[in-house]
Amino acid sequence: MLVLTRKLKEAIQIGDDIEVVVLAIDGDQVKLGIRAPKHIDVHRKEIYLAIQAENNAASLASITSLQQLSDQLKKGGKYDER
């Protein structure tokens, strides 16, 4: 992990497209501004992890539903979504 020290209004450049600026420091909180292209998602870590968990749960539900549908079709029956 690269560790950098920055003062108020100083920035860090990541590649050609991403800039992180220290906007404010208040006690133990630091407010950061992030400039990044629109195609790059920027989230707080806890939000990112929640999104990943939801996506994983949704993909598992889809796999289960598809397997149930496949099993029913193999038996010649109709699929019941209940």
Curated annotation (Swiss-Prot):
Q: GO CC: one term? A: cytosol
Keyword field: Bacterial flagellum biogenesis, Cytoplasm, Repressor, RNA-binding, Translation regulation
UniProt entry tagged with the keyword NADP: no
UniProt lists the family membership as follows: Belongs to the CsrA/RsmA family.
MF annotations from Gene Ontology = mRNA 5'-UTR binding
Pfam families linked: CsrA
Q: Name one GO biological process term.
A: mRNA catabolic process
Q: Where in the cell is it found?
A: Cytoplasm
Which PANTHER family does the record match to this protein? CARBON STORAGE REGULATOR
By what name is this protein known? Translational regulator CsrA
Q: How does it assemble?
A: Homodimer; the beta-strands of each monomer intercalate to form a hydrophobic core, while the alpha-helices form wings that extend away from the core.
Biological role stated in the UniProt entry: A translational regulator that binds mRNA to regulate translation initiation and/or mRNA stability. Usually binds in the 5'-UTR at or near the Shine-Dalgarno sequence preventing ribosome-binding, thus repressing translation. Its main target seems to be the major flagellin gene, while its function is anatagonized by FliW.
